[in-house]
Amino acid sequence: MLDLKRIRNNPEEIKKLLSNRGEDFDVAVIDEIVTLDEERRKILVEVESLKGKRNQVSAEIPKLKKAGEDVTQIMNDMRKLGEEIKNFDTRVNEINERIEYIMLRIPNIPNPEVPDGETDEDNVEIKKWGEPTKFTFEPKAHWDLGTDLNILDFERGGKVAGSRFTVYKGLGARLERSIINYFLDKHTTENGYTEILPPYMVNRDSMTGTGQLPKFEEDAFKVENNGYFLIPTAEVPVTNMYRNEVLSGDILPIKHAAYSACFRAEAGSAGRDTRGLVRQHQFNKVELVKFCKPEDSYAELDKLVEDAESVLQGLGLPYRIVRICKGDLGFTAALKYDIEVWMPSYNRYVEISSCSNFEDFQARRANIKYRETPKDKPKFIHTLNGSGVAIGRTVAAVLENYQKEDGTVEIPEAIKRFMNVDFIK
């Protein structure tokens, strides 16, 4: 959520900054907010005046009664005054609801470093690590490898649940679990994160706090009749752990690493990378979430990207980093980097992690603040998160990049201690 004061003081600047954001967003609502805010402030001034008058007259009534004067007309006037105040209060509540409705649907303002552009083709590559894997034979796609090695069962996943669900079997299940353990160990013992195991269901306030609601409700799995949502990412429960709290500045930054299953309907994605493990309705992920002071947030973002990179480097998987352009930035981020792993079956890099600085956008929605000392006025914190990284896509990348001509798959050195085998065959 944006700062209403900033909108009030600089509406034209806000409209300009949001005009090429790439969201389905009409900047004209900024003018509506300014108009409503001005009306509300005028009403509040008037109400204060009326309440002052009512208090003054109310204090005089006992004196007039004691003096034997008739106060009938004065009492009638006070009742009318009370009705007037009540009507004003009703209008203020209506304005508040409308402003909140609009504010919850306004995307974040891009950082000046965000490149111009409309689609993912306009994202800017800033780094490459490793070289795309070369083969002396025709490599298989991970869905074929998984089927041939009897470690991924897409057919039975579809039978049990439907399209875009997968059953992991034998060494496939162990590979998934080994990667999870490796990521969590790396982030907690080397990168300084505290491990969190969060709930997989959250309430509407939590989904609103991190920005999934109201805009992306159609992409969420909702549990009917009780208001719960299955989490699309551990970012939601971990960020909302601190909702409506004022944190002490001396404990910042807070760094959490959370493994969870993630659930996404991904409406409108039919036909886009839906074969194999790349785009599933249910998948596992290790999420990195940070809470820090505003002046530290961009340095923390750089470190967050490095932490996400570290697990891919440990696995020896080639990747690149792109800075996301304005049109592809999404709703909540002020600045975002995608890490894309090389996927031979696609002959291109595929997103495996997004690392974002939301600045105070989520903190305003979730009301998360901090203060340096107990005497200081609380200020909104900055939140960041990044995939550290998506597990299913890592499984796919390992299978494809480490496959051998005989159809076996070598296990990366970093996870052999978890796998207890050198090859899947």
Swiss-Prot record:
<dbReference type="InterPro" id="IPR010978">
    <property type="entry name" value="tRNA-bd_arm"/>
</dbReference>
<dbReference type="Pfam" id="PF02403">
    <property type="entry name" value="Seryl_tRNA_N"/>
</dbReference>
<dbReference type="GO" id="GO:0016260">
    <property type="term" value="P:selenocysteine biosynthetic process"/>
</dbReference>
<comment type="subunit">
    <text>Homodimer. The tRNA molecule binds across the dimer.</text>
</comment>
<protein>
    <recommendedName>
        <fullName>Serine--tRNA ligase</fullName>
        <ecNumber>6.1.1.11</ecNumber>
    </recommendedName>
</protein>
<dbReference type="GO" id="GO:0016740">
    <property type="term" value="F:transferase activity"/>
</dbReference>
<keyword id="KW-0067">ATP-binding</keyword>
<comment type="similarity">
    <text>Belongs to the class-II aminoacyl-tRNA synthetase family. Type-1 seryl-tRNA synthetase subfamily.</text>
</comment>
<dbReference type="InterPro" id="IPR045864">
    <property type="entry name" value="aa-tRNA-synth_II/BPL/LPL"/>
</dbReference>
<dbReference type="GO" id="GO:0005524">
    <property type="term" value="F:ATP binding"/>
</dbReference>
<keyword id="KW-0436">Ligase</keyword>
<keyword id="KW-0963">Cytoplasm</keyword>
<feature type="binding site">
    <location>
        <begin position="264"/>
        <end position="266"/>
    </location>
    <ligand>
        <name>ATP</name>
    </ligand>
</feature>
<feature type="binding site">
    <location>
        <begin position="351"/>
        <end position="354"/>
    </location>
    <ligand>
        <name>ATP</name>
    </ligand>
</feature>
<comment type="pathway">
    <text>Aminoacyl-tRNA biosynthesis; selenocysteinyl-tRNA(Sec) biosynthesis; L-seryl-tRNA(Sec) from L-serine and tRNA(Sec): step 1/1.</text>
</comment>
<dbReference type="GO" id="GO:0004828">
    <property type="term" value="F:serine-tRNA ligase activity"/>
</dbReference>
<dbReference type="GO" id="GO:0006434">
    <property type="term" value="P:seryl-tRNA aminoacylation"/>
</dbReference>
<dbReference type="GO" id="GO:0005737">
    <property type="term" value="C:cytoplasm"/>
</dbReference>
<dbReference type="InterPro" id="IPR042103">
    <property type="entry name" value="SerRS_1_N_sf"/>
</dbReference>
<dbReference type="InterPro" id="IPR015866">
    <property type="entry name" value="Ser-tRNA-synth_1_N"/>
</dbReference>
<feature type="binding site">
    <location>
        <position position="387"/>
    </location>
    <ligand>
        <name>L-serine</name>
    </ligand>
</feature>
<keyword id="KW-0030">Aminoacyl-tRNA synthetase</keyword>
<feature type="binding site">
    <location>
        <begin position="233"/>
        <end position="235"/>
    </location>
    <ligand>
        <name>L-serine</name>
    </ligand>
</feature>
<dbReference type="GO" id="GO:0140096">
    <property type="term" value="F:catalytic activity, acting on a protein"/>
</dbReference>
<keyword id="KW-0547">Nucleotide-binding</keyword>
<dbReference type="InterPro" id="IPR002314">
    <property type="entry name" value="aa-tRNA-synt_IIb"/>
</dbReference>
<dbReference type="Pfam" id="PF00587">
    <property type="entry name" value="tRNA-synt_2b"/>
</dbReference>
<dbReference type="InterPro" id="IPR033729">
    <property type="entry name" value="SerRS_core"/>
</dbReference>
<comment type="function">
    <text>Catalyzes the attachment of serine to tRNA(Ser). Is also able to aminoacylate tRNA(Sec) with serine, to form the misacylated tRNA L-seryl-tRNA(Sec), which will be further converted into selenocysteinyl-tRNA(Sec).</text>
</comment>
<feature type="binding site">
    <location>
        <position position="287"/>
    </location>
    <ligand>
        <name>L-serine</name>
    </ligand>
</feature>
<dbReference type="InterPro" id="IPR002317">
    <property type="entry name" value="Ser-tRNA-ligase_type_1"/>
</dbReference>
<dbReference type="InterPro" id="IPR006195">
    <property type="entry name" value="aa-tRNA-synth_II"/>
</dbReference>
<keyword id="KW-0648">Protein biosynthesis</keyword>
